[in-house]
Amino acid sequence: MSVKWEKQEGNEGVLTVEVDADTFNKALDDAFKKVVKQVSIPGFRKGKVPRGLFEQRFGVEALYQDALDILLPVEYPKAVEEAGIEPVDRPEIDVEKIEKGENLIFTAKVTVKPEVKLGEYKGLGIEKDDTAVTDEDVQNELKSLQERQAELVVKEDGKVEEGDTVVLDFEGFVDGEAFEGGKAENYSLEVGSGSFIPGFEDQLVGLEAGAEKDVEVTFPEEYHAEELAGKPAVFKVKIHEIKAKELPELDDEFAKDVDEEVGTLAELTEKTKKRLEEAKENEADAKLREELVLKAAENAEADIPQAMIDTELDRMMKEFEQRLQMQGMNLELYFQFSGQDENALKEQMKEDAEKRVKSNLTLEAIAKAENLQVTDEEVEEELSKMAEAYNMPVENIKQAIGSTDGMKEDLKVRKAIDFLVENR
């Protein structure tokens, strides 16, 4: 095999590959073995037609496409490795010369990973956020725990207040006409939760059980149902029941109820403080790392191919869909409720996709510039962590992953981020 790489404008280039005749003839042999199984010629059983008769009847050219299908997936990656390039998209293959007994010549128009010109990435002067936890932070967290343990108790007397839960019937009208999805009976709504259209919940405050009221609101301009967006509406409301939150006492019994590992409120308070400190530390670390990466990427220069952005957008869409599925939703439902379509969502994600791609390219360039290497021991350590996380033997993890090349690249990028933190 001979390989020639010609760089063209931007990140494009042409790879010219010449495959020796013996290799091409072997591919023709394999192609014939595949094709002949489907060929019937009078006097011969299917699959038993002699090669010479096949070529006489159909021509050797009938085998060329199958031979290419066998050959290209093997020879193209070899050529890429020999040329030392990193394609980021499927190649455009053009066969220049194909003839039995001769060398095969094909070209591949390729988009490659861009070169990155690093700017400042050391001494970026970004500081880590303060991670101190105050007594107020701890008390607020305990109050949140208290709120989550609250019971709803029916108010026999009194009016609706912020934070109360009301059980109500409602029916909405636009231009005097009821609309689909605008009616419910015995619906439980926490007043002040922001669950309903802006202005709806505020108008319930002060009402008593049994009260009826016309609640006037205007649907937001960006409301998911286009036929309602921006329109004024009237909801006929009837309050059946008002429930107030009854908070448990903050005492030792409360502490034991929310955490069986503690015996007193003092122990719960101390444990809560440590948990908040750990959370703040992790949050500050993550923010610092993100800001350093973004700044280093901002200082770098790279002509990013659209193919890389498109690939990242597809990855982000899959991640988004997985998050929706965890919430019991899918893309179709999301588009229905949001009023968006796939193109609009991708356009919304585009800037983040570009930042992700440039950040990753920058980190790879930093790893190369600083000669950051990943050892076999570090790979084994990472595999062990994965095995522990998934509760599987390390060998099973290795089989599932196959090649560890991708893992090595990920670890190298992680080392580049560590380098930015240490040299900020």
UniProtKB/Swiss-Prot annotation:
InterPro entries: PPIase_dom_sf, PPIase_FKBP_dom, Trig_fac, Trigger_fac_C, Trigger_fac_C_sf, Trigger_fac_ribosome-bd_bac, Trigger_fac_ribosome-bd_sf, Trigger_fact/SurA_dom_sf. Transmembrane segments: none annotated. SUPFAM superfamilies: FKBP-like, Triger factor/SurA peptide-binding domain-like, Trigger factor ribosome-binding domain. Keywords: Cell cycle, Cell division, Chaperone, Cytoplasm, Isomerase, Rotamase. One of its GO terms (cellular component) is cytoplasm. It catalyses: [protein]-peptidylproline (omega=180) = [protein]-peptidylproline (omega=0). GO terms for molecular function: peptidyl-prolyl cis-trans isomerase activity; protein folding chaperone; ribosome binding. Its EC number is 5.2.1.8. Its main location: cytoplasm. It is an enzyme of class 5 (isomerase). Residues 163-248 form the PPIase FKBP-type domain. GO terms for biological process: 'de novo' cotranslational protein folding; cell division; chaperone-mediated protein folding; protein transport; protein unfolding. It comes from the Bacteria. It is found in: Cytoplasm. NCBIfam families: tig (TIGR00115). Consists of 3 domains; the N-terminus binds the ribosome, the middle domain has PPIase activity, while the C-terminus has intrinsic chaperone activity on its own. Belongs to the FKBP-type PPIase family. Tig subfamily. Involved in protein export. Acts as a chaperone by maintaining the newly synthesized protein in an open conformation. Functions as a peptidyl-prolyl cis-trans isomerase. This is Trigger factor. It comes from Bacillus licheniformis (strain ATCC 14580 / DSM 13 / JCM 2505 / CCUG 7422 / NBRC 12200 / NCIMB 9375 / NCTC 10341 / NRRL NRS-1264 / Gibson 46).
